Amino acid sequence: MKSLMLVVLGNTEISTVPGISVAGATPELTKLTPPADAEYLFYEKPKIIDVIPVTPDGHPTPAIITKAARELANFPLMIVRGGTYLAPLVPHVHISDYVGRDFRKGPALQEAEEIIARARLFGEELSNTPIEELVIGESTPGGTTTAQAVLWALGYEARTSSAAPNNPQSLKEEVIKAGFERAGIKPGDFKEKPLEALKQFGDPMMAAVVGIALGFKGKVVLAGGTQMLAVAALLKALEEDMSRFMIATTKWVVNDRSATFIDTAKDIGIITYAADLDFSKSEFKGLRDYENGYVKEGVGAGGATWLAVKAGFSPEDVSRKVDELYRRLMELKAT
């Protein structure tokens, strides 16, 4: 089966709420994480900033897993700009430069339908190629909060994961409740109005992935953790046949006790795959800490591992390759 991997980039103002996202060394730097992640997949290090995206504690972006899987299995990969502050300095498909707004102050994404329409055209074009399967990952700091807001609006009692070991769940809920008050709704009020849920609380990555998935007629693997559950829930509410979709994530998301990944996936009715990566024997603390609940997923890490496994590599091969890439980064840093 011919597969193509897409990584959809998105930004939301929610990532700059202090304490909500660790997908960047500071809240302000989360604005640069999506293009930097995209660039790292193609170059030895990002162009837009001189460092690889890290958490405030120095844990490397999960793009390192996607890059490792790709170096092993050599699958084709394209970057899609769903809506970001800055364009990545790699060839990419431009859907929009709209950024998700802070939904406590007003609707998050008035342009949702425009983004879906453009992304749908792209999905339709991909259907005219020999590609039979899309594996769609994302890089969207703050996106687990927008995902949880959308899931709640659609009536799911979901808790999303976090790139931090201590999931800022109470802060997320406080932000979401403020957004619901602003919109004058209760959880579940947009069950029959998925596009309204997306407009009020979503982000441009979600809108772009929904559009691509609506336009493409083959199999779609949503490569991500709890953020892709929100995409799946939107697609289901839009009456898509869920049998052509699956979610590929990592064991770290599935094992996250603070989130409801498996239960929410069952509620939506989508099958899941969890990449059994193991960094416990890594020589680098930044990677070993993935086993302690840091980072967990992103940039399609689980889906990329799944593609490598389909190509005959093991999760152990991917884990070893990640170590090698991290070593290369350390050597670059030293020069």
Curated annotation (Swiss-Prot):
InterPro entries named in the record: Nict_dMeBzImd_PRibTrfase, Nict_dMeBzImd_PRibTrfase_arc, Nict_dMeBzImd_PRibTrfase_sf
Top-rank taxon, per record: Archaea
MF (Gene Ontology): nicotinate-nucleotide-dimethylbenzimidazole phosphoribosyltransferase activity
Position of the signal peptide: none
A Pfam family: DBI_PRT
HAMAP family per record: UPF0284
Family matches, as NCBIfam families: nicotinate mononucleotide-dependent phosphoribosyltransferase CobT (TIGR00303), PRK04447.1-1 (NF003368), PRK04447.1-5 (NF003372)
Family under the similarity heading: Belongs to the UPF0284 family.
Name listed for the protein in its UniProt record: UPF0284 protein TON_0688
